[in-house]
Structures are given as C-alpha cells and as structure tokens.
Design a protein with these regions (language model features):
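Short internal beta-strands
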Residues: 11-16, 126, 264-265
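Rossmann-like NAD(P) dinucleotide-binding subdomain of oxidoreductase/dehydrogenase enzymes
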Residues: 1-102, 220
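Conserved residues at the C-terminal ends of beta-strands
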Residues: 44, 62, 110, 242-243, ...
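A generic structural signal for well-ordered alpha-helical segments
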Residues: 3, 75, 139, 173, ...
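Conserved C-terminal structural/oligomerization subdomain of aldehyde/semialdehyde dehydrogenase
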Residues: 93, 144, 190-278
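Short glycine-enriched loop/turn motifs at secondary-structure junctions
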Residues: 52-53, 86-88, 118-120, 153-154, ...
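ALDH superfamily catalytic-core signature
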Residues: 33, 66-201, 223-224, 263
Length: 278
C-alpha cells in the first residue's frame, strides 16, 4: 500500500493458498488501476520464481524465513533492495504482578484471532511459576467465554488455511500435555483452540513459528533466564510483556530485540498509525 500510495508502479503477487482472497484483491486492483501501472499476478510458486527473475527496483515480501532467504538470494542477483517482513516465535512473558483476568483475556484474544493465523500472534507463553496455575485457569475460562462449550460450532472461530498447514499443526499436539482443546477435524481443517503444557525448549513445537491455534506454555523462575532463552532464538516479529513493574518493563525493553513490543496487551501495536511495523 505504501508503494502504491507513493505513486509507484507495482506487481502484486498474493498467496496461492488463499485463492478466494486473491481473486477479490485482483478484481479490486483491476477496477481501480490501469494494469500498465499496477496489476495482480496470481499462480503457484512457479509464477513467483519467474517474477523473481525480473529486475525490480524494490521487492517487498511478507511470509516465512525460509522463503525470505530465497527472495533475498534472487534479489541479490540484480542488486535489488528488499524489505522482508518475516514471522517468528513471538514470546509472551507474564510476571506475577498482573491483573490475572484482564491478562488472560488479552492473551487469549491475541493468540486465537483467525485461529492463531496472524503474524504477530503470541507464539508461546513464558509464565512465572508463581502465577502459572491461576493464569492457566483464567485462560481456560476465557476460551469457554469466547468460543463456547464447542468452539467448532462458534461463528467467531476460523479454520486452518490449508491441508498441509493443518497436518503440520496436528503433529504439535502430540507434544507436551493438552490442558485445553486438542480436538481436530481433518475434513473441515478444524483445530480447537489449544493450551499445551509441559513443553520443553527442545520440542519441535518450539523450533518453528506455529501460526495456528496452539499455545505452548513454559514456566520460569527468573526473568533473566527467560530473557536469555528469548534471545537464543532469532529476533521475533513481536514481543509481549505483562507486568505492572516499570523496572521490569524497562529491563525487557532494553535487553531484548523485536519488531514491535506491547506491554500488558497483545496485537494492538499494529493499529498505531504513528509507528513503523516490523
């Protein structure tokens, strides 16, 4: 949008796994702009590969790190500058000095929007041992409040975008201990909003961005150790901290690095028109 608003010519290549959305975008662009200046190109990865052979003035890519590396490598052949908006494992840290019910609602809301398929969803929960049991209980209550006894029947709960993505996510449910949700339906690509306890840093669910309705929970005793674990991972797109303590807030802000940080809430930093994103 920034490139178009600035008056540039642009080729837009939406994802092939969301064809209905891609068609709406293609129709909207075609109705609004001269195709000689701005157009939408649809197709699978072979189309993307062909586009990457062209000499663009700039490439902007949103997606995962693996494909981001492919885009950067192809752009380097022509010395084309790139902007990569990549995902990652966005942590959510919860200290004991919180309002439990408010925090639980904001975490559940941020995690399970679009069944967890947003790039800045909290990827995993780092919760202090002192508050863990109370917070988990509050989050379980929130899930029922938001989506009812059976989330599969809720009009507010989404499905997984593709069969490939569904199968990848379902494998994560075999790790740790499911303490909420866990139900699946392959035919409709439904995965219940799930809380996953007793997860270790070595589990596969902690090795890649989840991008789905599964929230691993890891407890900690010392904030310094929690920060060290976060910093051992690649830089996250988002980071969330729930704490009323100003000193702890400053500590996390100064000792971590992320695309964006929100204190005592989730997701909402993306809505600020005064801040850059990523």
């Amino acid at each position: 949008l920034g490139a178009i608003a600035a008056g540039n010519c642009a080729i837009i290549k939406p994802s092939e796994i969301t064809p209905n959305t891609s068609k709406v975008l293609a129709d909207l662009i075609a109705q609004t702009f001269d195709p000689n200046y701005i157009t939408v190109v649809e197709g699978d990865k072979t189309v993307s590969e062909e586009l990457l052979q062209q000499k663009f003035d700039h490439i902007f890519y949103t997606g995962g790190s693996a494909v981001g590396k492919i885009v950067m490598k192809a752009a380097a052949e022509h010395l084309t500058p790139v902007t990569l908006e990549l995902g990652g494992k966005s942590p959510c840290i919860v200290e004991p000095d919180i309002h439990v019910e408010h925090s639980a609602k904001r975490i559940i809301w941020g995690k399970f929007i679009n069944a967890g398929q947003t790039c800045i969803a909290p990827d995993y929960l780092l919760v202090h041992r002192e508050i863990k049991e109370e917070l988990v209980s509050a989050m379980q209550a929130c899930l029922q409040e938001f989506y009812g006894e059976n989330p599969q029947e809720s009009s507010d709960y989404s499905r997984i975008v593709s069969e490939k993505h569904f199968n990848r996510l379902r494998q994560f449910l075999d790790q740790g201990k499911v303490i909420a949700g866990g139900e699946t339906d392959a035919e409709t690509r439904y995965i219940a909003p799930t809380l996953l306890d007793r997860v270790s840093w070595e589990d596969p669910v902690m090795e890649e961005e989840i991008f789905g309705p599964i929230l691993p929970i890891i407890e900690y005793d010392d904030l310094d150790r929690a920060i060290a674990q976060i910093n051992a991972y690649p830089k996250p797109l988002a980071l969330y901290l729930f704490s009323k303590d100003k000193n702890k807030q400053q500590k996390v802000l100064q000792e971590t690095s992320a695309g964006g940080v929100t204190l005592n809430d989730t997701i909402i930093h993306i809505a600020s028109t005064e801040l850059p994103f990523g």
